[in-house]
């Protein structure tokens, strides 16, 4: 019985930690992406929690599912048109979190190399100034 319990607990830990990334006080939570077709673009959304006493910077991202990955900020201009601007640095203050969400910051997956269907998962590596690279698992979901 103890072997079954230990195996179950180990499996549970693996499942929980595969859904988020954590390195040196930086936790990446709730990562998801929109469905998309090969050749189109998609976006990744997530929350980054900086548990350290120093500010951190997200400086890049990459994934094998797309030709490129860029950090973008969506915003509404004075004419009411949505625009996107590439971001070279996103600051996560010490002991704080930022959310990459629809209509704001996000990771743009440029030119998908394959279809992304609801339920699929794929890795994305986030590049941080201090923590280095953190690879997370992203689930494809329909936006609410």
Put a short name on every predicted segment.
Residues 10-13:
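Residue-level signal for mature regions of secreted extracellular proteins and peptides
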Residues 16-19:
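C-terminal motif of bacterial Sec signal peptides marking the signal peptidase cleavage site
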Residues 23-144:
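Compact, glycine-rich, soluble single-domain proteins
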Residues 1-8:
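Bacterial N-terminal signal peptides that target proteins for export
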């Amino acid at each position: 019985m103890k072997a079954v319990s230990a195996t179950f607990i180990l499996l549970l830990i693996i499942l929980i930690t595969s859904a988020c990334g954590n390195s040196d006080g930086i936790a990446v939570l709730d990562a998801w992406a929109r469905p998309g077709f090969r050749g189109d673009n998609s976006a990744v959304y997530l929350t980054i929690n900086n548990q350290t006493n120093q500010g951190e910077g997200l400086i890049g991202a990459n994934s094998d599912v797309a030709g490129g990955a860029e950090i973008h900020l969506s915003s509404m201009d004075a004419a009411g048109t949505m625009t996107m601007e590439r971001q070279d640095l996103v600051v996560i203050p010490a002991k704080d979190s930022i959310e990459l969400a629809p209509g704001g910051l996000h990771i743009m997956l440029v030119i998908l190399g394959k279809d992304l269907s609801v339920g699929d998962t794929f890795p994305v590596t986030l590049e941080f100034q201090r923590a280095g690279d953190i690879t997370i698992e992203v689930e494809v979901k329909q936006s609410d």
